[in-house]
Curated annotation (Swiss-Prot):
CDD domains: PRAI (cd00405). It comes from the Bacteria. It holds the Pfam family PRAI. One of its GO terms (biological process) is L-tryptophan biosynthetic process. It catalyses: N-(5-phospho-beta-D-ribosyl)anthranilate = 1-(2-carboxyphenylamino)-1-deoxy-D-ribulose 5-phosphate. Belongs to the TrpF family. Pathway: Amino-acid biosynthesis; L-tryptophan biosynthesis; L-tryptophan from chorismate: step 3/5. The gene is trpF. This is N-(5'-phosphoribosyl)anthranilate isomerase. Gene3D superfamilies: Aldolase class I.
């Protein structure tokens, strides 16, 4: 049986975290990127993680952050997986001795084809839409057909996903993990419970 896993990213409050967890999210993303409208600090992150039930993975998202700050956050917040969304290389990402996911901002098929060789130590790759000045959470999507024949390292689909299009996205790409942020929001940084539930329910329905 294939289980399509879901990550709800950009969680900013314990209430949103709890709702997503109870709706069946496999993972929740905390954004430690000050320029993001969904950014959290250590205090907020501690409150969110303290509210979570067992067996919900917490993912910390960083964008070109210093190693010193990353270590400080990892020491104070219970993080299971790190997601690097900037211009980090494999050597930088692996130094924290924590499973990591590397976001790949897709422009062409070669971005997908070369990703596994560039990040051999990544637990998984996350394919997201390219934007010249923003690192994720843009609401943009890329050409999903580029992933239709991909069979490399485990991967996650992101970029412009919503409750309305995640069905199509999974069918085209064969994704076994999907990541959403803006597509399930009432406003930037605030999740819409109905959208979160609908997104997860669709992914669960397509599991087999």
């Amino acid at each position: 049986m294939r289980k399509i896993r879901t990550k709800i990213c950009g969680i900013t409050t314990p209430e949103d975290a709890l709702y997503a967890a109870h709706a069946g999210a496999d993972a929740l993303g905390l954004v430690f990127y000050p320029q993001s409208p969904r950014a959290v600090d250590i205090i907020k992150a501690q409150k969110i993680t303290a509210a979570l039930p067992p067996f919900v993975s917490v993912v910390a998202l960083f964008v070109n952050e210093s190693a010193q700050n990353i270590r400080r956050i990892l020491a104070e917040v219970p993080i299971h997986i790190i997601q690097f969304h900037g211009d980090e290389d494999d050597a930088f990402c692996r130094q924290f001795h924590r499973p990591y996911i590397k976001a790949i901002r897709v422009q062409t098929a070669s971005d997908i084809r070369n990703a596994a060789d560039r990040f051999p130590d990544a637990q998984a790759l996350l394919f997201d839409a390219y934007h010249p000045s923003e690192y994720g959470g843009t609401g943009h999507r890329f050409d999903w057909t580029l992933l239709a024949e991909y069979s490399g390292k485990p991967w996650v689909l992101a970029g412009g996903l919503t409750p309305e299009n995640v069905d199509e996205a999974i069918r085209i790409t064969g994704a076994e993990a999907v990541d959403v942020s803006g597509g399930v929001e009432a406003s930037k940084g605030k999740k819409d419970p109905a959208k979160v539930a609908a997104f997860i329910a669709t992914a669960n329905r397509l599991s087999r």
